[in-house]
Amino acid sequence: MTADQRFLVATGMRNEGPFIVEWVCWYRMLGFDILVATNDCTDYSTDLLNAFAAAGWLTHVPHKPREGQPPQRSTLRKVIKHPMTSAADWVLHCDVDEFLVLHKHDTIAELIGPPPYDFQAMVFNWKCFGNGDWDKYQDGIVHRQFRRCGMGHLRFNRSIKTILRKPLEFNRLGAHFPHGFHGDWSAADNRVVTPSGATLPQFQTRENHPIRMTTQD
């Protein structure tokens, strides 16, 4: 962490035991605090996460989705209400199979830079990888096993993930982009940018339909 800014990555998990260590180490390497919400685990995930929590590596909170409620939506509601979110300056939501790759920086603090900021959020392309011609599970490091992906111009590689500033200024988080901004998107310091610093044009056309993909490289 920098002295001035706290970066939080939040995720929901259920029975992700074999993949937890790699994911946690990856995001700690990038400089994130980690918040994990689990539901209905039947493997050793909760024991492992509790051990990480006892060591101070992350915060683990259980949650129970309501009947008929998608687990991810329950997770995101749990996250937005958690004290770690209110204490964070920047929040990123990622699943356990999603790894943020920084090409020109070693940490998220180096990429975002010091305050003051003239942008509200930064978006990253969500690149999809295939199964590497494997037809069954094999133990190993995820980011080294699956290295083949679709070309960048394909539609499924146009989706985004978002790290956002002042998360409590939104009604709720989203898998790709948050919902219900309380501020004014037209304000100069509420831009949405790419990692290169370019402003993303027309990133939100209607209040209830936030961006999920971009046509920019």
Residue ranges of predicted features:
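Active-site-proximal specificity loops/subdomain of glycosyltransferases
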Residues: 44-91
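Short beta-strand-to-loop acidic/aromatic patch adjacent to the donor-nucleotide binding site
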Residues: 88-101
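Active-site beta-to-alpha loop of glycosyltransferases that engages the nucleotide-sugar donor
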Residues: 11-25, 40
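Anion (oxyanion) recognition and catalysis
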Residues: 28, 54, 116
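Catalytic-site signature of metal-activated, phosphate-bearing donor transferases
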Residues: 72-74, 102-217
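Short beta-strand/loop segment that forms part of the nucleotide-sugar
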Residues: 32-40, 61-65
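Hydrophobic targeting segments
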Residues: 5-11, 26-28, 33-37
